[in-house]
Amino acid sequence: MIVIMKAGFLFLASLCLLVQAVPNKVADKTYVTRQKNIYELFWHVDQPTVYHPELYQKARTFNLVENLDNYNDKEAVNEFMQLLKHGMLPRGQVFTMMNKEMRHQAVVLFRLLYSAKTFDVFYNTAVWARFNVNEQMYLYALSVAVIHRPDTKLMKLPPMYEVMPHLYFNDEVMQKAYNIAMGDTADMKKTYNNIDYYLLAANYTGWYLTKHNVPEQRLNYFTEDVGLNHFYFMLNHNYPPFMLSNSLNFPQIRGEFYFFLHKQVLNRYYLERLSNDMGEVSYVSLDHPIPTGYYPTMRFRNGLAFPQRETGATVPLHMQKYVQMIHDLHTRISTAIDLGYVVDSYGNHVKLYTKQGLNVLGNIVQGNGDSVNVQLYGQLDLLVRKVLGFGYESNVKYQVVPSALQMWSTSLRDPVFFSIYKTILDYYHKYKENLPKYTTEELNFPGVSIESVTVDKLITYFDHFESMLNNGVSIQSHAKAKNTMIKARQYRLNHKPFTYHIVVNSDKNVKGMVRIFLGPKYDEFGHEVDLVHNYMNFMQMDEFVVNLKSGSNTIERNSHESVFVVPDEVPSDVLYNRLVVSEDGSETFKYSSQPYGFPERLLLPKGKKEGMPYNVLVVVSPFDDSNVVQIDSPVWGRHIYDGRAMGFPLDKPVDPLLLVLSNIHVKEVLVHHREMEELNVAL
């Protein structure tokens, strides 16, 4: 429930020669009104007649058939009406995009919303759908439509952990929230401005009953971080797997983007494992017992518990047909990489070792809408999740209980997720290994040398984070909801802001692209690992353009300026309040041109009290304006690509010569972990 509150934010500034800044934009009244109306659609979708009951009359008077001419995609309107006539997924049932029939219905609903010719038609359709389709399907289709419609560009969705808190918080805290909503006010309550506030401690899985045979539970603070899981939810909205690129004017990079983003997430997880004295992510075999168990303590909104997977469990017999399908798809994809081509749906050979080859490969591995032959190469990604998640299915239509791996919001919580993508990324590495290594000419920047790299002291800590739970419980009335605020308080990993100080010498005035990576210095046994054998485990931290002048250049880049990160989401109640006061003209409303990104708090692994060694690698490369491509993403905002591969130069096996070039520099850093009370800083 939205409650009017006020909050302020401090934005830090730092100096850089040329920064790809993320500017804030000033919203006009139309934007503010639309953003406010959209926000309201996400709240209490399971009780649409109770929350904002005035929308009920709007829904009753809207008729899809009478508005047929107000949609560009009339086929979608007609198909949706047929689905509705013959029975769609009922309200109250569990929804997952990884179920074929549910996915089809959600896609048709999205097409209906997306093709509305005007915002008013879109909004009226969304209001109508809020009362008439499955709640979770509605939230998914509405989210994708808001992100991709031109007239809602850069409008924010409420944080999904406040829209669907049952998918981000354990059942223990949700049960306490239910009790409060039902009148149990035994917990501490504070009243301010006639609003009753409840603050509930939220723990991570395993705090009560630790599974000693699941060492990955030590990482729950990372894998269950609500900001990280919200990031992954949004990642899958940038290029929804079901969409065709040309239908929404996507740039032809989604396959490469799929590999790169999952590589980033996997490498970040590995860095966190090292902070906890754990080694590389292990592979998982479908033909042997699965060593990593998963014991979620979460429930779906209708009360069904998430499936669990026992430690050492084997794939059940009824899933064996899918295991064989996975083996077949693996063979076909691996063979295609070796042969250098895939076969499209017309029987034509599509070469892989071309400029678009990696994109083609990523599309067939994911099995997305751009796959050249989904019948031959299938949907390996979804199939492996289905088998390893141990979700429940029955022969009764719509009776499914998806696993954590089968929900975008919960995928990262299961440690097997990272084993899955370690295997999937083997296709990426195999492909890259078959390419020629970078030559000295491709890596060098003549006349430019990095003289030194220093980084501020790196300090991490856990601090409190509060998140609203109201939307996960039933409300008695709109008025009661307005006067109640239930929040979960949780410890989350954070770090002090830090700055890279890079001194670069140039013999001329020239533009350069700076890339910064963070990777392991030692393995879990304390053995030093060299870059040549460990290049694939580095996470890219940042990239930005600089104008180098002739002579010495001091570049300073703050951690919060990274093109990959964003600060924590503004709480829903705070943002809604800003919209309310902006709509009446009392204040100006500003919004970011980069709506989403990786959580800035999680840039650094936890480290250790005495300091955990890692390597920072800095590369300065020539920047040629003629090769620049600007890509506008509805999720990540505008980014500049200089024509090089994502993750360059660590996307390919590293030649030892990389380390002797003057425009490449490796620096050891220590990441120190502190208790919050140890920090001599005002937080």
UniProtKB/Swiss-Prot annotation:
The record's Gene3D superfamilies line, in alphabetical order, gives: Di-copper center containing domain from catechol oxidase, Hemocyanin, C-terminal domain, Hemocyanin, N-terminal domain
Name the principal localization, coarsely classed: secreted
* Induction profile: In 5th instar larvae induced by juvenile hormone and ecdysterone. Post-transcriptionally repressed by miRNA-34 and miRNA-210 but not miRNA-317.
Which terms in the GO cellular component ontology are assigned? endocytic vesicle; extracellular space; nucleus
| Annotated Hemocyanin N-terminal domain residues | 32-153
Q: Tissue range of expression?
A: Expressed in the fat body and secreted into the hemolymph (at protein level). Present in trophocytes and oenocytes of the fat body (at protein level).
**Which terms does the record give in the GO molecular function aspect?**
nutrient reservoir activity
Keyword Disulfide bond in the entry? The reply is no
The UniProt record lists the Hemocyanin middle domain at 159-428
> Which pairs of positions does the record mark as disulfide bonds?
none
Where is it localised? Answer: Secreted; Nucleus; Cytoplasm; Cytoplasmic granule
Query: Keywords assigned by UniProt?
Result: Cytoplasm, Glycoprotein, Nucleus, Secreted, Signal, Storage protein
Q: Name one Pfam family in it.
A: Hemocyanin_C
Which residues are reported to be glycosylated? Answer: 203
Signal peptide segment = 1-21
Q: Tell whether Signal is among the UniProt keywords.
A: yes
Top-level taxonomic group: Eukaryota
Q: Which residues form the Hemocyanin C-terminal domain?
A: 437-673
Q: Which family does it belong to?
A: Belongs to the hemocyanin/hexamerin family.
According to its UniProt entry, what is the function of this protein?
A: Storage protein that may function as a nutrient supply to compensate for lack of dietary proteins during metamorphosis and egg production.
Look up the further comments and give them. Answer: Hexamerins are evolutionarily related to hemocyanins but do not bind copper and have lost the ability to bind oxygen.
The entry describes its oligomerization and partners as: Probable homohexamer.
Q: What is this protein called?
A: Hexamerin 70b
Q: Which organism is it from?
A: Apis mellifera
From the broadest rank down, the organism's phylogenetic lineage runs: Eukaryota, Metazoa, Ecdysozoa, Arthropoda, Hexapoda
